[in-house]
């Protein structure tokens, strides 16, 4: 039987705020080659997030505060395929896909990042499950 699962907004806000608090004071947005949450793959660019990384949840969504550009990216020969939100110690909290458009995170400058390139993030939101 097919169906739809939803959660009350208050619960979604709790989950979204838990993501933020778990990221702690040194959160990072890391663009990566292929990988999974358990095995995130090679880091191409690492951007530091503000403390706290996100504002309070509303409607199950948190919006990132300032994200500092990586001004000396490691670079890659293969396209970026994933991104992680992780603690400063490297614990992955969120793993998502990346594409040029129509994905969870969209890279407007292309998916291949050159060594030494600057990688910036102009806006980022996280939405807890519906």
Provide a role label for each language-model segment.
Residues 1-83, 87-130:
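Small cysteine-rich, disulfide-bonded extracellular modules of the LU/uPAR three-finger superfamily
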């Amino acid at each position: 039987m097919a169906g739809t699962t939803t959660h009350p907004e208050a619960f979604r806000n709790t989950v979204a705020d838990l993501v933020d608090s778990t990221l702690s004071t040194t959160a990072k947005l890391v663009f990566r080659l292929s990988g999974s949450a358990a095995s995130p793959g090679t880091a191409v660019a690492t951007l530091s997030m503000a403390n706290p990384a996100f504002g309070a949840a509303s409607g199950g969504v948190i919006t990132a505060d300032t994200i500092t550009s990586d001004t000396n990216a490691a670079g890659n020969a293969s396209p970026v395929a994933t991104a992680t939100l992780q603690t400063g110690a490297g614990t992955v909290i969120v793993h998502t896909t990346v594409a040029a458009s129509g994905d969870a995170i969209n890279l407007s400058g292309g998916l291949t990042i050159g060594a030494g390139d600057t990688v910036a993030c102009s806006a980022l939101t996280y939405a807890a499950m519906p």
